């Protein structure tokens, strides 16, 4: 039965990315003997980025984002590929990814291809602070390059994991910057001995501006252990009574 299914697939089925070309070339059927070569070719042909390498932090974030996608179980890949990617992450083996390449609706094709290139033992990686041939780093860590099967070249290269990873890192940076900005603002107002009306909850609630209300709330938290403002608030409460 299995042999019959394989024979039927080879002779009758046309599945995009498995036995067809990619994009505008999807109209062309790929010969059975070239199916594996097709998957290697999509990786190698798209590993054409230019410019400086992405920082290791961005690369690691992209690898984690790609791993998360694989763990959904819908990419059509072998578990060995996932396991190798996990080892790369844990050992801080970072694929060399040039900063310039395709990014957009079709996915981070160039950037992800550079990740895929290292998983098959080719290209270069940053390891222990140095740019080294992937094959040498794999040998040092007793790892074997992954042997691509049908569809896996497409599965690894097609996605938006790089822009997602970079976006997550920048979101974390933005949150940190926001907290530092709020802290600095509170300190400046403390030094200037300014009134605390600008953080008044009733006053900010009247504005109906959620962003303003949130910042005022954050500032009140920072000011909660300020002797100056705590004393001022106590005086206001006493006057109100």
Residue ranges of predicted features:
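Glycine-rich loop at the start of a catalytic domain that most often binds anionic cofactors/ligands
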Residues: 24-38
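N- or domain-start disorder-to-order transition segments that initiate the globular core
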Residues: 1-12, 65
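Accessory "access/gating" subregions that flank catalytic or transport cores
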Residues: 189-241
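A short, basic-hydrophobic beta/loop patch
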Residues: 40, 46
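Active-site cavity-forming subdomains of large catalytic enzyme subunits
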Residues: 47-55, 61-209
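Polyanion/phosphate-binding surface patch
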Residues: 8-13, 28, 211, 215-216
């Amino acid at each position: 039965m299995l042999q019959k299914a394989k024979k039927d697939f080879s002779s009758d089925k046309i599945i995009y990315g498995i036995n067809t070309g990619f994009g505008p070339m999807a109209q062309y059927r790929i010969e059975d003997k070239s199916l594996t070569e097709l998957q290697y070719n999509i990786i190698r042909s798209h590993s054409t980025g230019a410019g400086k390498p992405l920082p290791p932090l961005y690369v690691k974030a992209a690898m984690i984002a790609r791993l998360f996608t694989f763990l959904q179980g819908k990419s059509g890949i072998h578990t060995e590929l996932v396991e190798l990617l996990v080892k790369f992450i844990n050992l801080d083996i970072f694929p060399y990814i040039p900063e310039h390449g395709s990014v957009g609706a079709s996915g981070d094709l160039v950037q992800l291809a550079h990740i895929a290139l290292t998983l098959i033992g080719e290209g270069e990686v940053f390891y222990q602070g140095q740019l080294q041939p992937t094959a040498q780093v794999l040998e040092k860590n007793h790892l074997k390059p992954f042997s691509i099967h049908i569809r896996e070249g497409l599965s690894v290269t097609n996605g938006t994991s790089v822009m997602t990873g970079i976006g997550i890192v920048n979101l974390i940076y933005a949150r940190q910057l926001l907290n530092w900005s709020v802290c600095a603002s509170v300190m400046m107002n403390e030094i200037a001995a300014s009134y605390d009306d600008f953080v008044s909850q009733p006053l900010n609630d009247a504005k109906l501006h959620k962003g303003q209300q949130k910042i005022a709330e954050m500032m009140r938290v920072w000011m909660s252990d300020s002797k100056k403002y705590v004393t001022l608030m106590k005086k206001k409460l006493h006057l109100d009574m």
